[in-house]
Regions:
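Soluble "head" domains of membrane/secretory-pathway proteins
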Residues: 1-127
Length: 127
């Protein structure tokens, strides 16, 4: 993937952006922003709720079969984001304590272009 590292110098990460972030173990991951600073995220019955309201997710995004720590409401701090992988059943993301809420300073940029696999060269759109 190609990453725009400058975009968040002039703007803020938005819901559904696909971002690269650095985990506390210094590994890099690519995930989608679901929860924004100040919001409360919960996963109930396979659906994502933001501040108690059902999230209208993008077409093609899978339901969440495992809520993890989001089975109870998670309040995000002013600089925290809740990230999920698009392949919900096999993604290590904010639902799990080893990732948890991702701080703004951990986000390194927005995914802009996919170059692998070669048959799927494509620009990445947030919505």
């Amino acid at each position: 993937v190609l990453v725009n590292r400058l975009i968040y110098d002039v703007g803020k990460p938005e819901r559904f952006d696909i971002v690269v972030f650095e985990r506390e173990d210094h590994k890099k991951n690519v995930k989608r922003i679901i929860g924004l600073p100040g919001e409360t995220v919960q996963i109930k019955g396979g659906y994502i709720f933001i501040d108690g309201e059902l999230l209208n997710a993008e077409d093609g995004l899978e339901q969440v079969s495992l809520a993890g720590r989001a089975d109870t409401p998670i309040k995000l701090e002013d600089n925290e984001y809740f990230l999920l992988g698009d392949n919900r059943d096999s993604s290590e993301d904010s639902r799990f304590p080893n990732i948890g809420n991702v701080k703004r300073e951990q986000i390194q940029g927005k995914v802009w272009f996919r170059i692998f696999p070669l048959l799927k060269l494509d620009f990445i759109h947030s919505r």
